[in-house]
Amino acid sequence: MVSTSSFKTTKSEEIFTAAQKLMPGGVSSPVRAFKSVGGQPIVFDHVEGAYIWDVDNNQYIDYVGTWGPAICGHAHPDVISALHKALDKGTSFGAPCMQENILAEMVIDAVPSIEMVRFVNSGTEACMSVLRLMRAYTNREKIIKFEGCYHGHADMFLVKAGSGVATLGLPDSPGVPKTTTSNTLTAPYNDLEAVKALFENNKDEIAGLILEPVVGNAGFIPPDAGFLEGLRELTKEYGALLVFDEVMTGFRIAYGGAQEKFGVTPDLTTLGKVIGGGLPVGAYGGRKEIMSLVAPSGPMYQAGTLSGNPLAMTAGIKTLELLQKPGTYDYLDRITKKLINGLLTLAKEAGHEVYGGSISGMFGLFFTGEAVHNYEDAKKSDTAKFGRFHRGMLERGIYLAPSQFEAGFTSLAHSDEDVEKTLQAAKEVFATL
């Protein structure tokens, strides 16, 4: 960890200044630019376990975990060893490989809704593909998504989206034709009556409904009791498909994802992050009768040059093997509760209004005194105060997501000592806000 007196980011500043002349905003993904929290973005050099080091050799305890995939900790030796062996055989084949079969079997065994799976290269690609599949299966065009839920940056999903769209305060995105989003209906998360009204007003037109079963891209927002069950009932009643976007929650909040955790089985599921072990990956899957429509078995076309590449498959296999060990999710649940409960207590003792919670290795903290059940509630947070909190923690060697509207993540590499150091830093920062 660093101290405020020794915290220097000279090299990060030099590299980021140069990057701004080479890439839009100096980054390859918007949230990395620290626009919503202010201050100098950090340029990383290397990672290991629960820690990251920047190019100025500052060390941080990391609660971003490359936005979720690093559930076993960064650069886990078993994953690295497996990748070295796979790398000796080549980086990509553009043809079937045995690793695809192994990872597919593991995913099918773990996720209740998945009987067949197709691998792609990102969560965005998975959600784009599953949307096409929903429409192909039902022969309907309209879909329902929820305000603040993020399903990647494809045109049809950039309507009241979360993640970077929420972070930057963008209403939607220029360049997206109205015709592209005219069939995208939105409802507030955790509002069953609003969903029912959409179904009633668009009878026999809605192909399906997609959501993050636990919102992570508008901050951490869990489903209210009965919400997921209610969506399952409504979709069945109106002949629509239910899709869980488990790119973030899959293998994160339970080995079988949110659908295992809450006991609600959707028709289709999208995955990413954890199943690639830190390498680019995505997947979508569901019932065989639906997945059989995907080419070459059926007429719905979808393809990818690097889909199912041996490196991503190898990293995913080894990561899931590590997660199968007894006690994995109990440990994540305990260490994360210790962290979030400590943060909430310290903030309130210092006189700050906060709200937050956790499920397994996923957590969130809002700077608001009101309960957060949806995106509108989340937007009431004091983002300026969060920005100051983020900077104070960064200067003390704690790396949090640089946005009030992103969930945080722990890993199996985080120790009680890491959490205690984090809480000590937070106590100091809360006293300065």
From Swiss-Prot:
Cofactor: pyridoxal 5'-phosphate
One Pfam family of this chain: Aminotran_3
N6-(pyridoxal phosphate)lysine: modified positions: K273
GO biological process: chlorophyll biosynthetic process; protoporphyrinogen IX biosynthetic process
Subcellular locations according to the entry: Cytoplasm
GO molecular function (one): pyridoxal phosphate binding
Reactions listed under catalytic activity: (S)-4-amino-5-oxopentanoate = 5-aminolevulinate
Main location: cytoplasm
Class of this enzyme: isomerase
InterPro entries: 4pyrrol_synth_GluAld_NH2Trfase, Aminotrans_3, Aminotrans_3_PPA_site, PyrdxlP-dep_Trfase, PyrdxlP-dep_Trfase_major, PyrdxlP-dep_Trfase_small
Paired cysteines (S-S): none
Xref: NCBIfam families: hemL, PRK00062.1
Assembly and binders: Homodimer.
Protein name, entry field: Glutamate-1-semialdehyde 2,1-aminomutase
Organism: Gloeothece citriformis (strain PCC 7424) (Cyanothece sp. (strain PCC 7424))
